[in-house]
Structure formats: structure tokens, C-alpha cells
Amino acid sequence: MNNNFFNSDFDSILRRMMQDMQNSNQTSNKKYYINGKEVSQEELAQFTQQGGNHSAEQSAQAFQQAALRQQGQQSGNGNYLEQIGRNLTQEARDGLLDPVIGRDKEIQETAEVLSRRTKNNPILVGEAGVGKTAIVEGLAQAIVEGNVPAAIKDKEIISIDISSLEAGTQYRGAFEENIQKLVEGVKSSQNAVLFFDEIHQIIGSGATGSDSGSKGLSDILKPALSRGEISIIGATTQDEYRNNILKDAALTRRFNEVLVNEPSAKDTVEILKGIREKFETHHQVKLPDDVLKACVDLSIQYIPQRLLPDKAIDVLDITAAHLSAQSPAIDKVATEKRISELEHDKRKAVSAEEYKKADDIQNEIKSLQDKLENSNGEHTAVATVHDISDTIQRLTGIPVSQMDANDIERLKNISSRLRSKIIGQDKAVEMVSRAIRRNRAGFDDGNRPIGSFLFVGPTGVGKTELAKQLAIDLFGNKEALIRLDMSEYSDTTAISKMIGTTAGYVGYDDNSNTLTEKVRRNPYSVILFDEIEKANPQILTLLLQVMDDGNLTDGQGNVINFKNTIIICTSNAGFGNGTDQEYDDIMQEMKKFFRPEFLNRFNGIVEFLHLDKDALQDIVNLLLDDVQVTLDKKGITMNVSQDAKDWLIEEGYDEELGARPLRRIVEQQVRDKITDYYLDHTDVKHVDLDIEDNELVVKGKS
């Protein structure tokens, strides 16, 4: 076997190796390689036998051809389908699929398209989360049960991952070869139906450009689809169907569209009941009927940007997972081992006549046995409606509460809470409170916002402060307030700051700071349009739709829901100087600045009155309370005499400017002087504020 590649030394090495193999009884740990390929002992022996009659090149080539034949046999067309796909029909036979409820119509339409002689390719079109994949799983279950036309009663639905067809195809022609193997596999099986989720990905999939001559997946499949040699079920969204599939007319006519709409709330509850058992078994959590209904109702109310049943199922799954984590499963092995140890200790105690100790050990054994018994097949936790509310709060940040007795009392008292913060504006507070009570109690009509109000009046009387307090009272923090200063929206291009720019303009892809995007991210918000009279007329035109229909379409075509927002517009224009003006006077005055159709959209137009000195007495107390909150961080208490309060009111009172001068006086005379005193006496624990010689003085105690 002497040649350019091997010499006699290699022959001797090979003979010794074969002799060692024969003499050794332990062959399981030995591996043999030829040309980088792992081979068995028999293949190696065959190779050595051929070595005397053939050259090394011929022997290596023969071995490679044999290996390729073996690989081809192992990856036959039928097996190729199994390698890259899931057999949904087989999973249905094995009971691995969730039950599909309320989709009989869509399943029937899909089955009818599949039973056609040609162009038997249904495509399920619907928004994300409505259950397109579930319909295909329902069809697989219907095939197993025999509730389908005779033409497809023996079909096997194979779910194909498109990425698996592209994996490893680094050389030209490899992708096309995979597709041909797929098509041949379907032809040879004669009963396979391929299911492509996100089927829009087949457009251009595998193509490397027009100059390379490499075709994409859709181009390769078109002839087989039109002749009925291969049957495909597709699933995609409305947008992807319009932007990808419909642009290819030849591909579109080979598919038959099956529309999949969002199920109703009632159907979604039935869907949750159908899958409840699997979730209970998985999480070991009991899920009563009222919890299922709460999942649907609260997800509809607080997660409007997603669709049923997906969002309701997610809420149910997250809640059960959270409860399961709070009640971890008992470690059965460790517990049984501990019981065995305690039994041994008990016997020793009895032998030593330590009966009290033995009794204590027996009680511990009984406790562990009870835990084992309760955890063996039993649900360790029971979900409640309150748990669903907590899940919604974690997902959205909205403090969700149910209409229980405490919440009813809270709604009743909302006006008194607001009046304690907004001084001297009882009429405005009461009007806003009525709108909120009506909405939270569920007596609103249509899809309009919770409330829309126009606050008019002089500066510094509490218009903006009422909006802030509403955000805190309803949604828990000031971050729920979206404040827009209309002086920034006075030019003709300001509308792009509201809804974003349209296609073809700069900034089309970046709408992150627009009003519509802020509301989409935080659907429960108080929207404040400050000094609305300064806004461009186009802004007011947009607000007509928001206040009437409760939605707004942004520059990218997305419909944003404003149903759960409170819209407040403020204006300094046309307010009266008197304190006893009637509603008709305000409306008549506002018509000088705003169009009648704009004013007519508001739930209420409220005049904020000038503040008198009695109102400032309550306001100064609120401002001093804010100072005390700051001092609490330093561990300092504060006492302010009545003379000091009267002095602050006298210095800060201005009927035309409202409460803002008083805020400045408190900042300059109280905060600044306490700061100066603290810097000189860092160990101070208490400060007293009083008037001496018509001047505010600060005295402290350590």
C-alpha cells in the first residue's frame, strides 16, 4: 500500500491497531476516524480490506460515497418533514393540544378550503393575539375526531418553522435543495398539509438578490401550489398580509383568505373555562369562575392595546404563576427523609422512656405528613379577583380596585378630598367629581373620555393644581398627568407634535414624544392642555374627534384610545372679574375666542373665581405642610404661629395674581430662612417661626 499518501509504516500501524482491537474486550470507549469521519469497527475493517486492492484515494472516495448514501437514507423525504416540523395531528391524538372553543365557523371555513381540488390553501388573516394558531390546532383535533370533509379526513398537519429551512444553507443551491426535499416529502406522504405561521416571511425568504439567480421560497412553491401538489395553511396579520402577500398577485390568487376576528367577551370566558384545567394542573392553583370573568373584564378595560383572548390568557397565566411562586411546592423527597429521621428519633426517645420528647416528635411527624398529603395532587392556592387586580396593576401601573364597599365610599368622598387640596373652587371640583363617579361606577355611555372640561379664570386660582390632584387621586402619582403647554403648539406644524408626522416626512419613524404615543403607553392619564387659546386651530380640530369619539389616529395609522383619559383645557381668556357670574355669561364670553362646535364638546365649562383672604388661610396651611414634608427628611419639626401665617397672607395676597405670590413668599421667607438657620445649626431638631418687628424670624432647638 505504498503510494504518495501512505507508506509501509502506515500499514504496520494499521495492522497493530486491528490486532489491539481483536485482543481488547473493551471497545465501547474507543472511537475511530477516517478522513475526519467517525466510523464503526466493521467499517474500519472493511476499509483495511479494501486497502490492499485499491488506492487510498479510491478507498476514501468509496467510503465517502457510502457515508453520503447512509446519510441520504437517514434523512429521507418523509423523515425530513419530521426533522423540521411538528405533527399537530399526532399531538391532537396524544391529547397535547389545548381545547379550541368558539371557533367552529373559522375551522369549518378552513376545512372547506383544504378540501378543494386545486388552490386548496387557506390563509388565516387576523390581528395578533386573536387565536389564528389555535384555529389550526382546532382543525387538527377535528381531523382526529372525524368532523371534517372526507377529502381531508386522513390529512396530517405539519407545522413548519421557516427559519429551519434556511438554517445551514450557506452555499448557493442548499436552500433550494431543502425546499425540494420539503415538496418531495409532501408528495411522497400524500396526506401532509403544511402550516406556516407568519407566512408573510416566505416573501423573499432564501433569495440572495436578483443578480444571483437564487429564488425565494414563495417563487419555488408557486407552481406546486397552483397545481394542488402541495397544500399550505398560512397565518398572518392584516398589516403583513396587505404589505407583503397582496403585493404579489400571483401568490395571492393561490390562497383563500379566512378572516379571524377577535372573540367576544362571552366567548373568551368560555375559552378560559376550556383551558382552565391545564393551567390548574401546571400551576397547582385553583381558578374559580369569577376569576376567569375578571381576567376578561379587566383586560378589556385596562389593556386596550391588545386583543382577546391572548391578553386574558396572559393575565390568567401571570396570576397563577405569581400565586404558585408564593406557595412553593413541598419537596417530597426531603420531607419523607425528614419523617424517617424523626421516626428513628422517636423510637430512641421511647426506648429511653422520654415520653414527652417522643410526643413532641410525633406531633412534628403528623404536621409533615399533613403537608405531604395536602400537596399531593391538591391545589395549594386559590386565585381571587383581587389577585387579578394586582396582576393588572403590575402590568399597567394603574391602581386597579374593585367596586367593593370601600371603593364605593372612596368614590363618594372624592369631592371632599379634592376640596381639601383645591381651595375656593367648589363648583369646579363638584363637576369633575360627578364625571369621575359616573365613569368608575360604570354608568358612562359610548367611548368618550371619562370627562372633558374647560377651566377658565384668572391666573393662580388652582386650574392646573386641580389637574395634578386628579392624577394623584385617580392614578396614584403625578406621572399620570400629561401636560401640554399650548404656547409650544401655536405654529402650523404643531400638529406633528400631537400625532406624529405622516409618511414621507422627516421624523416619520420617531413618534416617541407625541401625545398619541404617550396615551398609548399610559392609557389612564389626565391630559392638561394649558392655555388652550394659544393653540393652532388645527389642534382644536383634532380635539373635536377626541372629545366626541374617544380616539385619535396617529401619523402611522394606529388608532389610539382616549376612553380612559380625562381631558382638561385651561384658559385665561375672557374670564370675569366678578365672583357671581352665571354659566351663560361664561359661555357667551368663550364664544369670542373659540368656535361653538369646540365649546359644545365639553362636559362642562367652569369659571374659577378670584381667591379671597379666607381662601388663602387654607392655602398657606397647605404650603406650610409641604415645607414640613421637606423638613421630615432632615428629622426636623416646625411650628408656625398664627401671627406668622397672617403676615405671610398679607405679604402674599394679590387678587389679580391668585395664590402664586403667596407661594413665592413662603419660598423666600420660610424655606430660605430655615435653610440659612440649618446651615448655621446643623444639629437643630425643631424650629419655631414667629413675627418680630414686622419680620419673620426662625428660632430653633437642638
UniProtKB/Swiss-Prot annotation:
Keyword annotations: ATP-binding, Chaperone, Nucleotide-binding
Bias (Polar residues): 46-55
Pfam hit, one: AAA_lid_9
Bilayer-spanning residue ranges: none
Domain UVR: 336-371
Biased composition, class Low complexity, residue ranges: 56-74
GO molecular function, one term: ATP hydrolysis activity
One GO CC term, this protein: cytoplasm
Binding, ATP: 126-133, 457-464
Region: I, residue numbers: 81-332
Region described as II: spans on this chain: 383-575
GO BP field: cellular response to heat
InterPro entries documented for this protein: AAA+_ATPase, ATPase_AAA_core, Clp_ATPase_C, ClpA/B, ClpA/ClpB_AAA_lid, ClpA_ClpB, P-loop_NTPase
Region of interest (Disordered), ranges: 46-80
Function: Required for the development of induced thermotolerance.
Entry similarity comment: Belongs to the ClpA/ClpB family. ClpL subfamily.
Name of the protein this chain belongs to: ATP-dependent Clp protease ATP-binding subunit ClpL
Organism classification: Bacteria, Bacillati, Bacillota, Bacilli, Bacillales
